[in-house]
Curated annotation (Swiss-Prot):
Its EC number is 4.3.2.1. The lineage of its organism: Bacteria, Bacillati, Chloroflexota, Chloroflexia, Chloroflexales. This is Argininosuccinate lyase. It comes from Roseiflexus sp. (strain RS-1). Keywords: Amino-acid biosynthesis, Arginine biosynthesis, Cytoplasm, Lyase. GO terms for molecular function: argininosuccinate lyase activity. The gene is argH. It catalyses: 2-(N(omega)-L-arginino)succinate = fumarate + L-arginine. It is found in: Cytoplasm. Pathway: Amino-acid biosynthesis; L-arginine biosynthesis; L-arginine from L-ornithine and carbamoyl phosphate: step 3/3.
């Protein structure tokens, strides 16, 4: 493809070092699609005849079929997916294959391929995010009015609905989907026609190329177009953040499934055992999901580090963009269905969750009681803090303090102060949009349902 200027053969180790076919071969669909579109433009501008165009398109479709059914045979000389396709095309249709690359560089060719591939990955990952959202939503709809302790700093804080906690993991995934959709808008910019750096001398219709390939715009600057990998960095950031959200869900599920909590039992299908301890049932699905966050962050850092310090236009360093990209996509395309399955088959235990509720979690409600009767919140906070300390010193629950202690705490306290110690009442009082009251959560469920149905 490029050997005419050289007097010596490439060193065998250098050839191995330079070769990317082992990993970029997965872009065969995109490479062939781009080449078919390019062949049509070559015919439109008169570089090849209609007959030659048809020969090239037919040949490329034959190469496509060989890849699709696993018959494609690679050669040691296949430096990358582009050379592999062109080499096989030449074997099938003869010397006319040599005209296909007219006016095109591998610089704009690979930039086009990887954008097309990334757009496909975004669609697949969005589908899997939606499936995980659906699993969380189904559990939330089933949970009804079940209560659980809400935690901050992993300390008991306030009672919340189980459904509210489940949906707390739904909305980060919705933001992930929105970020990916936004990333897709910038990814769908066509570099083809930019050549190596200065643009092609052929008056191809780049807008028509973009339309044929499902792109929404053409790149405005050829130098930028062949070196722009912003979309990969952006995709990898989205992937790393998805990993972080999966890690948070996993951490909660791991903790809540432990014997010390007992809030949820994971299905056998998403658990493993111990080679030594017969009694063990380990939450390996969620532990691996938690671990993948580090891998996804590593993929992002690898690409950002590679991009730092590059001069403008194309450099071979950019070949290093694909393995982190492919790895991140592969990781999520497996991790997300595992997460969805593990969530969908998990069995929650509302009775154990309610048993874990503690009267001290209603201390804020007691402060609210005082505030409703005109006591400044900071003073109310201090008063309730003293009552909590009094209960701790007596070794009793906050609600078990004698009524006289509450009445003596502040003149506004009346016997009805003990009504504060009702977990269901506490939850029901938090009715603002986004809060944990049943009516607020029902509206949240309806909103979440619209999100998954609208795709």
């Amino acid at each position: 493809m490029w050997g005419g200027r050289f007097n010596e053969q490439v060193d065998a180790l250098m050839a191995q070092f330079n070769n990317s076919f082992s990993f970029d071969r997965r872009m065969w669909r995109e490479d062939i699609r781009g080449s078919i579109a390019w062949a049509r433009q070559l015919a439109r501008v008169g570089v090849i005849s209609a007959e030659e165009r048809d020969t090239l398109v037919d040949g490329l479709n034959m190469v496509y079929a060989e890849f699709a059914d696993g018959r494609f045979e690679a050669r040691e000389t296949d430096e990358d997916i582009h050379t592999a396709v062109e080499r096989r095309l030449g074997e099938l249709v003869g010397t006319v294959a040599g005209k296909l690359h007219t006016g095109r560089s591998r610089n704009d060719q690979v930039a086009t391929d990887v954008r097309l591939w990334t757009l496909g990955a975004i669609r697949r990952i969005d589908d899997r995010l939606r499936a995980l959202q659906t699993a969380l939503l189904a559990q939330a709809e089933t949970a009804g009015a079940a209560l659980m302790p809400g935690y901050t700093h992993l300390q008991r804080a306030q009672p919340v609905l189980l459904a509210h906690w489940l949906l707390a993991h739904f909305w980060p995934l919705q933001r992930d989907r929105e970020r990916l959709a936004d990333c897709a808008k910038r990814t769908a910019t066509l570099p083809l026609g930019s050549g190596a750096i200065a643009g092609t001398p052929l008056m191809v219709d780049r807008t028509a190329l973009a339309v044929e390939l499902g792109m929404t715009a053409v790149s405005p600057n050829s130098i930028d177009a062949v070196s722009d990998r912003d979309f990969i960095a952006e995709f990898l950031f989205c992937a790393a953040l998805i990993g972080t959200h999966l890690s948070r869900l996993a951490e909660d599920m791991i903790i809540y499934s432990s014997a010390e909590f007992g809030f949820v039992t994971l299905a056998d299908a998403y658990s493993t055992g111990s080679s030594l301890m017969p009694q063990k049932k380990n939450p390996d699905s969620f532990e691996l999901l938690r671990g993948k966050a580090g891998r996804l962050t590593g993929d992002l850092i690898a690409v950002l580090t590679m991009l730092k310090g590059l001069p403008s236009a194309y450099d071979k360093d950019l070949q290093e963009d694909k393995e982190p990209l492919f790895d991140a996509a592969d990781t999520l395309e497996l991790a997300l269905p595992v997460a969805a399955g593990a969530v969908a088959t998990a069995r929650f235990h509302p009775d154990r969750m309610r048993a874990a509720l503690d009267d001290a979690m209603l201390a804020t409600d007691l402060a609210d009681y005082l505030v409703a009767r005109g006591v400044p919140f900071r003073e109310a906070h201090h008063i309730v803090g003293r009552l909590v300390r009094e209960a701790e010193q007596r070794g009793v629950a906050l609600s078990a303090l004698p009524l006289e202690v509450f009445l003596a705490a502040h003149p506004v306290c009346e016997p009805d102060v003990l009504q504060v110690f009702d977990f269901d009442r506490s939850v029901a009082m938090r009715r603002v949009p986004g809060a944990t009251a049943p009516e607020a959560v029902n509206e949240q469920i309806a909103q979440a349902r619209r999100c998954v149905e609208e795709r």
